[in-house]
Amino acid sequence: MELTTKLVGTCSALDRLYQSGSAKCLFPRNSRAGLEAVLLNTAGGVTGGDRLSFSAQVRAGTRLSVTTQACERAYRAQPGETGQVRNHLSVATGARMNWLPQETILYDGSSLDRRLSVEIEPGASLLMVEPLVFGRIEMGESLNDARFCDRIEITRRGRPIFLDATRLQGGIAAHLAKPFIANGAGAMALLVYLAENAEAVLPRLRQMLPECAGASLIGEDLLVMRVLAADSFLLRQSLLPALRLLNNNEIPRCWTI
């Protein structure tokens, strides 16, 4: 799927959309936060051999918020097969990009390789979150044999300003149970906020975080937050106030349904 924004007067609008396969996109009309795009995977999830990609160009002066209609699911994969997800965002000067997908749920036996790359110009801003849930906790599922590889790269003027990589393989539940890894957490999230007011909002953000979360300023305009939680419900209790603080008290409606 490929998506490009444009300015119509003072409003952000859709300029170009290309979609194929199981990837579909909806555009709610009641959004006050510029153009909102809701991604759907009509296949219901990702399994071994799947190839999904999304690309967005957020042009100068426009505002785009991207979310998902529901949680993405990484299903059990056949041996030797891996599902691939590739997302690429390009944010021009004066533009704002909100990358706010709902949780990705890893099933036991799943194999997922995911990449997110963001090219951001000076004067642009970004709010992104990637929530992750380790198994169907309410069903008693434990990740005894799964594979998850994730890489996030944010560049400005061709230079990396944020790189993050996660690699979990095999007995993920046993690994996360270690006290100095995740102490048995069933969910986690990474949040990145790149904006001129990043330093100013950091004290307020820290005040609302639980003990199993932390936020730091790693650049003059770059804030990073990480959260661990027992399950997705508690994870959202930490994420939603943070998203409201960093996004003018707005979150996508899909997050509240």
UniProtKB/Swiss-Prot annotation:
GO MF entries: nickel cation binding
Subcellular location: Cytoplasm
GO CC term, one of those recorded: cytoplasm
Highest taxon listed in the record's lineage: Bacteria
Keywords in alphabetical order: Chaperone, Cytoplasm, Nickel insertion
Family the UniProt entry places it in: Belongs to the UreD family.
Quaternary structure annotation from Swiss-Prot or TrEMBL: UreD, UreF and UreG form a complex that acts as a GTP-hydrolysis-dependent molecular chaperone, activating the urease apoprotein by helping to assemble the nickel containing metallocenter of UreC. The UreE protein probably delivers the nickel.
Role: Required for maturation of urease via the functional incorporation of the urease nickel metallocenter.
Official protein name in the record: Urease accessory protein UreD
Annotated source species: Ruegeria pomeroyi (strain ATCC 700808 / DSM 15171 / DSS-3) (Silicibacter pomeroyi)
Gene: ureD
